[in-house]
Amino acid sequence: MPAAPDKDKALELALAQIDKQYGKGSVMRLGEEGRAPIAVIPTGAIALDVALGIGGLPRGRVIEVYGPESSGKTTVALHAVANAQRNGGIAAFIDAEHALDPDYAKKLGVDTDALLVSQPDTGEQALEIADMLVRSGALDILVIDSVAALVPRAEIEGEMGDSHVGLQARLMSQALRKMTGAMNNSGTTAIFINQLREKIGVMFGSPETTTGGKALKFYASVRLDVRRIETLKDGGEAVGNRTRVKVVKNKMAPPFKQAEFDILYGHGISREGSLIDMGVDQAILRKSGAWYTYEGDQLGQGKENARKFLRDNPDIANEIEKRIKEKLGIGAQLDAEAVEAVPAPVDF
């Protein structure tokens, strides 16, 4: 019986050949180098950043945001775009629904002059444009609004009433197979906004499902279920919505966490309101009756006054946000050696 080959030597030879053929680092041991912290794009709501477990939406990954109509899906995506741009990133918006409101986007903090926008005619065109932008390596965040509006060319060119079973699902499956690797290499975060449909004849469990087949469910690293739970009123006038987001899938941290925050009409996610809610929960802010206090200083009587105080004093708002993140350990925690080895920032 021949002698068994030296496994270590055989492995080193194989690794050397792989490095030569496919480039250095094609295969590596997981513990061999300090792992870079997960770069993230903040969502604009600290409660949602906390629920995600890493401080925001992960870079280089597929994100699905779905929910009923007018629940705040596009608002959440546009806040992520604004935060990416604020940190010097390039953003693109594939407006398949042809419903993007530039004025509203500007109010949320989006630099509409720099935002790349496409209003494609077909689903194939939309996903081809998205793929080319991702492969350029220049893009930081891409939003596709929405999956339901990615209509296959055959359906557009066909007659009303023609059956096109599975066309959109096949289109999404092929596109995600092509794009996922390129996203990871380029660090582009892709947010797919999706709509809800109801399955017919479901007796048990939820009849709700999302459009575009099952591929997006598998490829998404994070899936967010956005729901409007309450209408906010000032006097008798509706001024916004209380929104609940459930993290139904999360490959980066434990899933099934929930976040609640306010979306104000014309202003988007209330960052200050989210800071007040989280600050009280974490005992960083004190609520006594209707008064909110921070470090002995009164912020205001009632949430609206406290919100206005923080809006007028951004330094205090930033300090509260920093303390909340430190207390909850949001983002990657690095030791001294890792900091030297990996200079990449935690927040995008």
Curated annotation (Swiss-Prot):
Q: Per its UniProt record, what InterPro entries does this chain match? A: AAA+_ATPase, DNA_recomb/repair_RecA, DNA_recomb/repair_RecA_CS, P-loop_NTPase, RecA-like_C, RecA-like_N, RecA_ATP-bd, RecA_C_sf
Q: Name one GO biological process term.
A: DNA recombination
Taken from the record, one Pfam family name reads: RecA_C
Localization terms from the record: Cytoplasm
Record GO cellular component, one term = cytosol
Q: What does this protein do?
A: Can catalyze the hydrolysis of ATP in the presence of single-stranded DNA, the ATP-dependent uptake of single-stranded DNA by duplex DNA, and the ATP-dependent hybridization of homologous single-stranded DNAs. It interacts with LexA causing its activation and leading to its autocatalytic cleavage.
Q: Which PANTHER family does this one have?
A: MITOCHONDRIAL DNA REPAIR PROTEIN RECA HOMOLOG-RELATED, RECA
> What name does this protein carry?
Protein RecA
Annotated family: Belongs to the RecA family.
Extract the GO molecular function terms from the UniProt entry. ATP binding; ATP hydrolysis activity; ATP-dependent DNA damage sensor activity; damaged DNA binding; single-stranded DNA binding
Q: What keywords would UniProt list here? A: ATP-binding, Cytoplasm, DNA damage, DNA recombination, DNA repair, DNA-binding, Nucleotide-binding, SOS response
Specify which residues bind ATP according to the UniProt entry for this protein.
Answer: 67-74
Please tell me the species this chain comes from. Answer: Amycolatopsis mediterranei (strain U-32)
The gene it comes from is: recA
The UniProt entry, under SMART domains, shows: AAA (SM00382)
